[in-house]
Amino acid sequence: MTLVPVTYKGGIFQHDIVVDLIEDLGGYVVQKHVLAQEVVLQCFVPREDIELIREISRPLFGEVTDSPLVGTEIAVVSMSLEIHHLPHPSCDIAEYVRRLGAKSNMVSLARGPGKRIAGLNDEERDVINEHDIAVYLLGNFETCIEYKMPTLRRGIEVPIVLCGGPDIEVLKKIIDPPVDGYVGNVGRFMR
């Protein structure tokens, strides 16, 4: 029996039927969120029983979706809370991984902006290392990313995915030693 991660979203009315079914089939609920009249269950269920759970949840107006990141904690690291660093791309990335089942936390650095003063303090480093993976969201400027990244990765023991404005090829060229993943063309762009 192979367990796969799924998310159930539906009304709170009679959601216990779905919870009991999941447990009876040999699966388990990782997290349960009750939001007003809606419930969200992140769970692991047997692969061969997903269609049965979908059939049972249909009359309850529930939907079952694949969620490959259930049980994963991801730190989305932003350079500051300022308007040019945090709100748009950081929130988009955090919401995207949340929809795939991950638990995302925003970490904004006290000394992130500026090439000269950029750095992590011990508390920030410890918080980032508590996660399964860290997504660093840096800016649009190659020189800034190249200069800051060695300082910002010092002491980080979890895999790092680097997001920035330059293309993937440019990010791979300017980061040494390499990080675990790159996502280019992410940031604030003129429209």
Regions found by a protein language model. Name each.
Residues 4-14, 81-86:
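Short, surface-exposed ligand-recognition loops at beta-strand->loop->(often short) alpha-helix junctions
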Residues 6-10, 41-49:
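Short beta-strand-to-loop capping motifs
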Residues 9-30, 52-53:
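Short amphipathic alpha-helix segments
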Residues 17-25, 56, 60, 96, ...:
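Generic non-transmembrane alpha-helical segments
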Residues 28-34, 55-76:
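Conserved short beta-strand edge segments in small beta-sheet-based binding/regulatory domains
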Residues 36-40:
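Surface-exposed aromatic
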Residues 48, 72-94:
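Short, low-order "capping/linker" segments at domain edges
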Residues 86-191:
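Conserved mixed alpha/beta catalytic, RNA-binding, or beta-rich assembly cores of soluble enzyme
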